[in-house]
C-alpha cells in the first residue's frame, strides 16, 4: 500500500513539474514573439542585407543587376505578345533583385488603418501615430478607400508616374503616357498647354497641402485627389477640405496652401504612409532618425509614388524623372524656368541616394524609364 502511495505522489509531482515547465516555456515564447513583433521593423532597418550573403548590398539588393529576365520569369511571360500587360511583373522582378520585398500594403488608408502595426508606431510622415481622430473623421465622409471600380476590375494594370523634371520637355511622350491604365501626377505639375510632352490623362494626383494646385480650374475631372501626409497639419488641412471648412493659411505650413479642392469626398484618398516609410528606410536607405522627419531622410514624392506603384500595379513606368547635377543651368521642371541648381538647396531630400535606388530598378527592368532621365 505504501508503495502505491509513493508512486502516486511521484506521478503527481512529475505532472506538476511538466505543467509548470510548459507554462514557463509558453510565457517565455510569448514574450519572445512580442519582442520580435515590436522590433522586427527596426531590426530590418538596421541589418538589411547582413544575412543575405555577399551577393547583396547593405540594403538587400542584388549586387549584380542586368536586364535579363530570371529563368522562371522568362518562362512565365514567354507567350505574352509585345506590349501586352504582364500580370505580377513589377513585383516579381522587384522580388528577384530584392528578396525582402512583399506586397502587404493597400494604396490608401481605409477604416481599418489603426490595426496595422507598421504605421501605428510612427508619427507622420512615416506613420499615423497621433492622427487617429483626424483620419477617422476624414474617412467617415470620403467612404471610398480603393481605386475606381473600373480600375479595380482590371486583370492587369499598367501604371506610369509622371515626374515634373525638365527632361520631359520636347520629348513628345504625351500619347505614350496616355496609353497607360493609370497615370499618376505629382503636386501642381500642369497638364494644360503641355499635352504633347506630358499627355492629357490624369488618374491620380498625389500631393501635400503646399504642393496642391491653388486654382480650382486647374484640377482634372475624373481624377482622384490623394493626400501624402508629411506632418499632422496636413491631415488637419484635408479635414478642412473634406468638410468644406475655412482653411487657415498660418496653420503650420511653409508656404500658402489651397483653400479649396474641387473634388467631392468620394474622390479623395489618403496615401498609405507605409510607402513613405518603405521608400525612405528600406529601399533608399535614408537615416532612420528614430522614425522622425530630419535632415536628408524624406524621400521625394516621385520615389514614394514608385514604391506605391510596385505594390499596386502589374507594370510600372516613369517619365520626367532624374536630376542632372552636372547641368546646373538646365530647367529643373518642364513647366517653369527654375534651374537645376535649386535642388541642392533642399535639406529634406537625398537626391544621390534616390538616384541610386531608381537606377537599380531601371537597370533590372523592374520599371521602364520613358524619358531616359534616370
From Swiss-Prot:
Disulfide bonds: 159-313
Enzyme class: transferase
InterPro entries, sorted: Glyco_trans_29, Glycosyltransferase_29, GT29-like_sf, Sialyl_trans
Record's GO cellular component terms: Golgi cisterna membrane
GO-annotated biological processes: ganglioside biosynthetic process via lactosylceramide; protein glycosylation
Intervals, Cytoplasmic compartment: 1-8
Protein's name in the database: CMP-N-acetylneuraminate-beta-1,4-galactoside alpha-2,3-sialyltransferase
Amino acid at each position: 500500500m505504501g508503495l502505491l502511495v509513493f508512486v502516486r505522489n511521484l506521478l503527481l509531482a512529475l505532472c506538476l513539474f511538466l505543467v509548470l515547465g510548459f507554462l514557463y516555456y509558453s510565457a517565455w515564447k510569448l514574450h519572445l514573439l512580442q519582442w520580435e513583433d515590436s522590433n522586427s521593423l527596426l531590426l530590418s532597418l538596421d541589418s538589411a542585407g547582413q544575412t543575405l550573403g555577399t551577393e547583396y548590398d547593405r540594403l538587400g539588393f542584388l549586387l549584380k543587376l542586368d536586364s535579363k529576365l530570371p529563368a522562371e520569369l522568362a518562362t512565365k511571360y514567354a507567350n505574352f505578345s509585345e506590349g501586352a500587360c504582364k500580370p505580377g511583373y513589377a513585383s516579381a522582378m522587384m522580388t528577384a533583385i530584392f528578396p525582402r520585398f512583399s506586397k502587404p500594403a493597400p494604396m490608401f488608408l481605409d477604416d481599418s488603418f489603426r490595426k496595422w502595426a507598421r504605421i501605428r508606431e510612427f508619427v507622420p510622415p512615416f506613420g499615423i501615430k497621433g492622427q487617429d481622430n483626424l483620419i477617422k473623421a476624414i474617412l467617415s465622409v470620403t467612404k471610398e478607400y480603393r481605386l475606381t471600380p473600373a480600375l479595380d476590375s482590371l486583370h492587369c494594370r499598367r501604371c506610369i508616374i509622371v515626374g515634373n523634371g525638365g527632361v520631359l520637355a520636347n520629348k513628345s511622350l504625351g500619347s505614350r503616357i496616355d496609353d497607360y491604365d493609370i497615370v499618376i501626377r505629382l503636386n501642381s505639375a500642369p497638364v494644360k498647354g503641355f499635352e504633347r510632352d506630358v499627355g492629357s490623362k490624369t488618374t491620380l494626383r498625389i500631393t501635400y497641402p503646399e504642393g496642391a494646385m491653388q486654382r480650382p480650374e486647374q484640377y482634372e475631372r475624373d481624377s482622384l485627389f490623394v493626400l501624402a501626409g508629411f506632418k499632422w497639419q496636413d491631415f488637419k488641412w484635408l479635414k478642412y477640405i473634406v468638410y468644406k471648412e475655412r482653411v487657415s493659411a498660418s496653420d503650420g505650413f511653409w508656404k500658402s496652401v489651397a483653400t479649396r479642392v474641387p473634388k467631392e469626398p468620394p474622390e479623395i484618398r489618403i496615401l498609405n504612409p507605409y510607402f513613405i516609410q518603405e521608400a525612405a528606410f528600406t529601399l533608399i536607405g535614408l537615416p532612420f532618425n528614430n522614425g522622425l522627419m530630419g535632415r536628408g531622410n524624406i524621400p521625394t514624392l516621385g520615389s514614394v509614388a514608385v514604391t506605391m506603384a510596385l505594390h499596386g500595379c502589374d507594370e510600372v513606368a516613369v517619365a520626367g524623372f532624374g536630376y542632372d547635377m552636372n547641368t546646373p543651368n538646365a530647367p529643373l521642371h518642364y513647366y517653369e524656368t527654375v534651374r537645376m541648381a535649386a535642388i541642392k538647396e533642399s535639406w529634406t531630400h537625398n537626391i544621390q541616394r534616390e538616384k541610386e535606388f531608381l537606377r537599380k530598378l531601371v537597370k533590372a527592368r523592374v520599371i521602364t524609364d520613358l524619358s531616359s532621365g534616370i
